[in-house]
Amino acid sequence: MVKPKIGIFGLTGCAGEQIVILNCEDQLIDILDAIDIRYFPTAMTKNDDKCELDIAFVEGAVVQPEDEELLKKIRQRSKLLIAIGTCAVWGGLPAMRNDVQREEFLEKVYGTKGKSFKSIPAQPLNNFIKVDLSISGCPIEKEQFLKAVTYLLHGDPPLLPSYAVCTECKMNEYVCMLVGKNKLCLGPITMAGCGARCPGYNIPCIGCRGPVDEANVASEVKILKEKGFTLRDIENRLRSFAAQAEILQEQFKKE
């Protein structure tokens, strides 16, 4: 039986998703019996950067012209391309202030030396190529990566959460951070899958997994305003991880 060829790539980011994959440890060893990893520079010294791939996992945002060039090459050689991590899916932290001219950032940080930088506003992968599946998270949950690989090996799309973090809070019987503790919590509009980890430690959800489908952002903002949070604080929180999401962009235009 021919093993599916897999590639694991990183664009501009922290490599958090690749570390999560390595931390799968025992489970990863079991998976290696069923797949042929041909490209994974974080874990391997010998990598094939030309072979055709059955599945490519790509983390990181497109922040440089070289990122875009590499991404398009990966797409051309891959049957399936999976975006992993919030940077790849939404643009992540690097894209939080794309509304500000990049030249202004570069000048403030690097002075005149910033003029030589070739970086571009950070963008998610699907702004450049077709993405077959997105697994969000900062970083991703290793269980979701393992599930995705297992399902894809059987030719099926993995079943990922399609509900909000609030649902996981209720399942865990946590006190609501928004209503019960009056915290600036984005749980009602954030994609689940983390097990409501932050609320479990008495920390409000900061939206690191990006917005859930059909999130009612306007109602979330209205509730937060009524609780005394300033529009600036609310917008800064919303921009932190998924500022490029269309549903959030629509809200920013209203304010």
Please name every model-derived segment.
Residues 87-92:
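Short gly/pro/ser/thr-enriched loop/turn and capping motifs at secondary-structure boundaries
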